[in-house]
Amino acid sequence: MSNNTLLLGAVAYDPKVVLIWDGFQAYFAKQGLRFDYILYSNYERQVAAQFAGQIHVAWNSPLAWIQSERIAAATGRKAEAIVMRDTDCDLTSIIVVRSDSPVHAVADLKGRRVAVGAADSPQATLIPLNFLGAQGLDPGTDFEVIYFDKLPGKHGDHIGGERDAVRALLRGEADAACMIDGNHLLFSQEGVIQSGTTRVLATTPTYDHCNFTVLDGAPGELVDRFRDLLLDMSYADPSIRPLLDLEGLKQWRAGRTEGYAALNQAVNRFGYVEPFVRQVAASCG
């Protein structure tokens, strides 16, 4: 892999991903940064590719960050979250019930059915299920978990699983549904949720979402230039605003990792990533 061009990996969860990275590629070229990207069908393939030295930077989901951090620890390497979006910070997930539901407290979910998104979705599955577990309800034991496992490997970036979970709730096939709070608003705007038909039962603690991940050994000058160009972007600049809108942000921020505590707890509870971590770590030997 050439160290003259910064090579980024991203997951193709939606056709707009090509528009986004073609746009950023053109912008970076105007700023003198040689940049290219590779699209992957799933985050596990992307994480493995980064540890195989095939990309310098990965645009990672929160679960892919946890995977990368743990593989790095297992192999004596260092992973760093260098940049994230303003919209990646301080998010919450919610557990929603129908307005006429007899469920008025988390404890009332015992013996009932909870619909979630994809099994690997931090926001629609792992974090809310861990939250319910911390409230004394063991998922799969104290209540039935109904998975809507759309596009595994995309870590819930494709929100179809959350949308299907809400529809199951509204049809009476589930007693509660889990989703990121922003999608509750989106589903209302789409007409999936009619006004007054649902209410929020509980809200998780805040957590963070995606970040750009680099490993030790990445070309420092290129990474620093990439980071500086991102952090210098202004939403007031009409040449870059459409790309920021597509990527869902108004400002890039320096990366931080304290916002992944809730997901780390969920991963520890469910043991979700350990087989993959061991597999990639072994391949690095």
Give the role of each language-model region.
Residues S2-G23, T213-V214, A218-G285:
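An extracytoplasmic/periplasmic, membrane-proximal ligand-sensing/linker region
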Residues S2-V103:
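Short, glycine-/small- and polar/acidic-enriched structural segments
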Residues N3-A10, R77-I94, D142-H158, F187-R227, ...:
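Periplasmic-binding protein-like
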Residues Y37-A48, G140-R167:
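Short helix-initiation/N-cap motifs at beta->coil->alpha
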Residues Q50-F51, L109, L169-L170:
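Hydrophobic residues within well-ordered alpha-helices
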Residues W59-A74, G133-A134, R163-S195:
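A ligand-binding cleft/hinge motif common to bilobed small-molecule-binding domains
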Residues V97-V114, A118-A119, Q135, P139-T141:
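Flexible hinge/capping segments at coil-to-helix
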Residues G117-G133:
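Secondary-structure junction motif
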